[in-house]
């Protein structure tokens, strides 16, 4: 039986790391064999691309070059890790997937959405997560949390307006989406964890 693909999405400071651990523990308790991934990254080549995407280099990275590197990293991960794991009946828990590009590059960078949809269809076809959990947070709150963790990477250093556009696109993508659940990430850690666990429990009941 094919495994399932669950993805966590959200802005910086939304609490994805904590949420990841909550879901991982819940899936393992349910007897699932879980493979953990992150984007960009997850394969040797994809990790090299991650470094180029997230850190300043001697050469300025254009928005479209950034986008293409993200998709190159993504297809490496999907073809070499995610699809084989699902075929073996394993469950995959991902830190970000294609929705990040739709939100960050389509919303934040304001790259043409037709181009994004064309890239998505060309690279991924109809492959998509079985469940996306989006941790929603006001960008000002999230960035304050992120700054508290230390030095910000190239993406995290974008303007507040960039993140408000990104959040708006996330909401457009997740509202009325049967395969997505929106979690209010500004609640207490305990309540966020409880809401996530409920979403996963509901999914486990219907996952076949």
From Swiss-Prot:
The keyword Heme does not apply. Pfam families: Thymidylate_kin. The keyword Chloroplast does not apply. It catalyses: dTMP + ATP = dTDP + ADP. One of its GO terms (molecular function) is ATP binding. ATP binds at residues 10-17. GO terms for biological process: dTDP biosynthetic process; dTTP biosynthetic process; dUDP biosynthetic process. Its EC number is 2.7.4.9. One of its GO terms (cellular component) is cytosol. Gene3D superfamilies: P-loop containing nucleotide triphosphate hydrolases. Keywords: ATP-binding, Kinase, Nucleotide biosynthesis, Nucleotide-binding, Transferase. Belongs to the thymidylate kinase family. Phosphorylation of dTMP to form dTDP in both de novo and salvage pathways of dTTP synthesis. This is Thymidylate kinase. It comes from Actinobacillus pleuropneumoniae serotype 5b (strain L20).
């Amino acid at each position: 039986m094919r495994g399932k693909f669950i993805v966590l999405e959200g802005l910086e400071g939304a609490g994805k790391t904590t949420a990841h651990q909550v879901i991982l523990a819940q899936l393992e308790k349910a007897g699932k064999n879980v493979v953990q991934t992150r984007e960009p990254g997850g394969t040797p080549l994809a990790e090299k691309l991650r470094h180029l995407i997230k850190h300043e280099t001697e050469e300025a990275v254009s928005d479209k070059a950034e986008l293409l590197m993200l998709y190159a990293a993504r297809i490496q991960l999907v073809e070499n890790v995610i699809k084989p794991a699902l075929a073996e009946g394993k469950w995959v828990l991902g830190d970000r997937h294609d929705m990040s590009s739709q939100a960050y590059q389509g919303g934040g960078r304001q790259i043409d959405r037709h181009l994004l949809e064309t890239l998505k269809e060309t690279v991924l076809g109809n492959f998509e997560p079985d469940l996306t959990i989006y941790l929603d947070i006001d960008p000002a709150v999230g960035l304050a949390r992120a700054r508290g963790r230390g030095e910000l990477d190239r993406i995290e250093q974008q303007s507040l307006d960039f993140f408000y556009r990104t959040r708006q696109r996330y909401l457009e993508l997740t509202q009325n989406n049967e395969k997505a659940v929106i979690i209010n990430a500004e609640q207490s850690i305990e309540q966020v964890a409880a809401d996530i666990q409920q979403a996963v429990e509901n999914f486990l009941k219907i996952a076949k």
